[in-house]
Amino acid sequence: MEKKITPSELELNEFIKIINEMSGIDLTDKKNILALKLNKFLEGTNTKNFSEFLGKLKSNRQLKQETLDFVTIGETYFLRELAQLKEIIYYAKSLEKRVNILSAPCSSGEEVYSLALLAAQNFIKDMYILGVDINSSVIEKAKLGKYQGRTLQRLSESEKRRFFLESEDKFYTINKNELCTCKFELCNVFEEKFSRLGKFDIIASRNMIIYFDHESKLKLMERFHRILNDKGRLYVGNADLIPETIYFKKIFSPRGVYYEKV
């Protein structure tokens, strides 16, 4: 039987600190459930104890990525928070030019492809959507564009037929011929690579900021401000709390709330 590797309170706090430094994510409130889940994860890391794991985590690049993949895994689906997605497309169409959209984090691609199919339904062709995420496994899934039927439950049958190719194993693969250009990149929003992604008219950052501490939120707002075009908009999730900064002003519109670049 596999020996369980259980972290001490100090070791767990050190792990949470390392993850925060790497990604900005604050796992303090999830300490109890994290301790339980770590046992299973550590079985595949070839470490004798948690202290050895922490030592490797600080220097082993592959282990860093595997650990980030572990702590950021989550479920998502197509057309999530649909009203806001429609508002993004409504604004994009009003610009009457080529529109660049950033989805950060993009998870396994459902948000990016949801925006793309809504754009297609609104006859928007000149649009580029880039999805970035810190989790390597979800980025690979997004690039593949193959999904289980349950993630498409909010789509009509006609939408499924137009935008997906159904396989015999009951998986659905995105029909990219029907969509605007969608790309995906592995990227940490706090690393230098993020600043080189280009300029965007819209950033959709939904259900990520809620996991950041206050300092990381402020840093992220500055980074978002830097890559947005003038009057660019930031859309966040319903649970995301945005600190007041010099970079954005909060706008209340009949179609919902967004943040405009100052």
Swiss-Prot record:
Question: E.C. number, please?
Answer: 2.1.1.80
Q: Which residues bind S-adenosyl-L-methionine?
A: T76, R80, E111, D133, N188, V189, R206, N207
Is Iron-sulfur included in the keywords of this UniProt record? no
State the reactions this protein catalyses: L-glutamyl-[protein] + S-adenosyl-L-methionine = [protein]-L-glutamate 5-O-methyl ester + S-adenosyl-L-homocysteine
- Highest taxon above the source species: Bacteria
Give a GO biological-process term: methylation
Transferase in keyword set: yes
Q: Which GO terms describe its molecular function?
A: protein-glutamate O-methyltransferase activity
Q: Which keywords accompany this UniProt record?
A: Chemotaxis, Methyltransferase, S-adenosyl-L-methionine, Transferase
Occurrences of domain CheR-type methyltransferase (ranges): 1-262
Q: What does this protein do?
A: Methylation of the membrane-bound methyl-accepting chemotaxis proteins (MCP) to form gamma-glutamyl methyl ester residues in MCP.
The identity of this protein, by name, is Chemotaxis protein methyltransferase
Tell me the gene name.
cheR
